[in-house]
């Protein structure tokens, strides 16, 4: 059974729902494309877990992007995904990163952009300042602004595994603050080691053994890159043929690299002629 799963659960006697995600292989696949410093490895793990949790809240088929931008040492960290829990991500940085640096110190003056793109319907975008010390706190602020529902998020990553939990009041009439605060206090006792080492059922039992919890079937989370030779050919087609021919003459080929999975697609003069004559370029992938 895959270690990479998202688990949704409900409390039978409270209008509160929860999610728990545990990631290993998909997390490692994202990290394997680049040699990231430890701080970015952990940040991408937290961001990946967060995106998985957010994706499970979507009520439509479509895509999600959670992007952190700033003017600090880390300029970009992004995880893109969809309602099928297929995720990919990348980060950009400059120079050495300080050990123990907070989110604000890593990104400087920055913001988080969450973009929801339904397969049908209008795109929604929410923006939250990166003015908290943790990614989890910034995401809680996003939920406060966008859904106005009390939400608690916990995120963990160590470069090998990533995990997260989300606790949220269900939309309903009445005041459920007391119920939520009680469950929030229980959830806050979870340790990273428990999420990394134990099965989800055992984690939930340890946290809520006095509560009645309904656990749904797990949803597998995978790394999935959307790059392709066809997409690269389409990008080449947006540049003038004269400019492309010049590059071919100087370099012998055009290399199109994917930042997410580090795959390189090579196009030679024959491929380019095929692209601009609207015929399919030969399949060549390195």
From Swiss-Prot:
Keywords attached to this entry: Chaperone, Cytoplasm, Disulfide bond, Redox-active center, Zinc
UniProt KW Cytoplasm keyword: yes
InterPro entries xref list: Heat_shock_Hsp33 (IPR000397), Heat_shock_Hsp33_C (IPR016154), Heat_shock_Hsp33_N (IPR016153), Hsp33_helix_hairpin_bin_dom_sf (IPR023212)
CDD domains: Hsp33
Keyword Cytoplasm in annotation: yes
Disulfide bonds: 225-227, 258-261
GO MF: protein folding chaperone; unfolded protein binding
Gene Ontology cellular component annotations, sorted alphabetically: cytoplasm
A Pfam family matched in the record: HSP33
BP-aspect Gene Ontology terms: protein refolding
Cell location: Cytoplasm
SUPFAM superfamilies recorded: Hsp33 domain (SSF64397), HSP33 redox switch-like (SSF118352)
Family indicated by similarity: Belongs to the HSP33 family.
PANTHER family cross-referenced by the UniProt entry: 33 KDA CHAPERONIN (PTHR30111:SF1)
Name of protein: 33 kDa chaperonin
Encoding gene, per UniProt annotation: hslO
